[in-house]
Design a protein with these regions (language model features):
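Membrane-embedded helix-loop-helix hairpins and adjacent transmembrane boundary segments
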Residues: 1-476
Length: 476
């Protein structure tokens, strides 16, 4: 165990204190939730400051705080720069958020859009992609909580994993999206402050020159700008990040929840604020060589370096910052996935006549169910965080072009949209296993684009945008 690690008593006290604080905050914010609109979309009245904070904080996930250092440790400079390219997803979604709000001012989920625009077959394929990705992301966040706690203290992986799941499920259950967005605002301030302080201490204590020399001596390939696997990862991650945001109900629910005119500015600024964070967290990981840290697993390198640099007090600080980052994503994902399952699953397939109160109760039950299922899937810890997240890249990247063409072009039909998502996913998964995780997303995206272009060229349709305004397609 490192000297900088926390003893189990202090770690447990922080965990309990943190949990009580967030759960109480969630209860306080959720007291006035009276309808499914209040619970799922925060009354569709979120302003610019909170909108920007939740966009940035939600994207600062286990990926940014644990996987970005892991990839810098494995791929060097292209690892951290490549991860920062995921900011393009947020920035490119900015004009799309405005388009979504104008087309579907009363929409609830991304599934609403796909079903109305392309029909039931495409909707079914899209739901498979969305639910699979959501579970992959939830499991990665649960695993990250366990990895964080076991890296910084004597507490086990299973204790940390269980704790973050229980805390996030409780305050999401009590407060809904309103609590999620408000806690994101606080968490974004903690995260930004923490990342800056840790980076400054790293530069002051170790020094850029010493870090460069150590990497040059012991792992020179990490500084090689022509490192083939790292270059492939760079381009793959751009499309992975875009696919994650374009398809996910986490971001669509925010487009619906933000005030009219806010979404475009909020997503653009959120992306710009997020852009440097993976570079900073990745840079910290390169100091592991100078500090003589050999992490038992590559995804533990970030917390171990930060704790070593900052000492015992720093370990507390690192714990709070990374835990905030994980919570800010898990609560958003729980809320958005429960909306998707409630609206597109329960209401559409099981109880079409469900009123607002019934949907509100169903949504809360789904949040609990998602928490339990995620806990069960996290128990074995079957992969590293990087491998788990990138496995879902084939799924999400295949949905990029059907969504873009669906929003801006009348010609793409449901048959070709379905084929694009299915063939794109299959191609990405095959190449994931044949070549590696760093080609899954880009290959899925290219195959999906080829199918979409074939549809536009050989069998174009003419979708009527007014279909979104018809009574059957406007949620009650």
């Amino acid at each position: 165990m490192l000297e900088a690690q926390l003893d189990w008593g202090l770690a447990l006290a922080i965990l309990v204190g943190f949990g009580i604080l967030w759960v109480a905050f969630g209860w306080y914010l959720g007291r006035d939730n009276r309808s499914i609109d209040d619970y799922a979309l925060a009354g569709r009245n979120v302003g610019f400051a909170f909108a920007t904070a939740t966009a940035m904080a939600t994207w600062i996930t286990s990926n940014t705080t644990l996987v970005a250092p892991q990839l810098a440790y494995q791929f060097g400079i292209w690892g951290m720069i490549g991860y920062s390219m995921a900011a393009f997803g947020l920035m490119l979604f900015a004009p799309m958020a405005q388009r979504i709000k104008s087309l579907m001012p009363h929409g609830f989920t991304s599934g609403d859009f796909i079903r109305t625009r392309y029909g039931k077959s495409a909707w079914a394929m899209f739901m498979i992609i969305s639910v699979f990705y959501a579970m992959g992301w939830l499991v990665s966040l649960g695993m990250a909580g366990g990895i964080l706690l076991s890296s910084l203290s004597d507490l086990s992986y299973h204790t940390g994993m269980s704790a973050i799941l229980i805390i996030c499920v409780l305050y999401t259950l009590l407060g809904g999206l309103k609590a999620v967005i408000a806690t994101d605002f606080v968490q974004s301030i903690l995260i930004l402050t923490g990342v800056v302080i840790i980076a400054w201490v790293c530069i002051d204590t170790v020094g850029i020159g010493e870090i460069h020399q150590s990497v040059s001596d012991f792992q020179p390939e990490l500084l090689n700008v022509a490192f083939p696997a790292a270059i492939m990862f760079l381009f793959n991650n751009i499309f992975f990040g875009i696919g994650e945001i374009f398809h996910s109900n986490v971001w669509w629910s925010r487009a619906f929840a933000f005030k009219t005119g806010v979404g475009k500015r909020a997503f653009l600024l959120g992306g710009l604020l997020w852009l440097p964070i993976p570079i900073v967290t990745g840079f910290i990981a390169l100091a592991a060589i100078s500090l003589g840290i050999l992490p038992p697993s590559a995804d533990m390198v970030g917390p171990l370096v930060a704790a070593k640099l900052l000492g015992s007090i720093g370990a507390v600080f690192v714990f709070v910052v990374v835990f905030s980052a994980l919570a800010s994503s898990m609560d958003s994902l729980l809320a958005a996935t429960s909306d998707l399952i409630t609206q597109d699953g329960y209401k559409r397939l099981i109880n079409p006549k469900a009123d607002s109160d019934t949907l509100l109760k169903a949504s809360k039950r789904v949040v609990i169910g998602l928490g339990v299922l995620t806990w069960l899937l996290c128990l074995p810890k079957v992969a590293t965080l990087g491998a788990l997240l990138n496995f879902t890249g084939a799924f999400v990247a295949s949905a990029i072009w059907p969504i873009v063409f669906g929003l801006y072009h009348q010609g793409l039909t449901g048959r070709f949209a379905t084929a694009a998502m299915a063939l794109g996913t299959i191609t990405g998964l095959v190449l994931y296993f044949v070549i590696g995780f760093y080609v899954a997303a880009i290959s899925a995206c290219l195959m999906s684009l080829a199918v979409c272009l074939m549809g536009l060229l050989f069998a174009p349709g003419k979708f009527d945008w007014q279909t979104f305004k018809e009574p059957d397609n406007v949620p009650e």
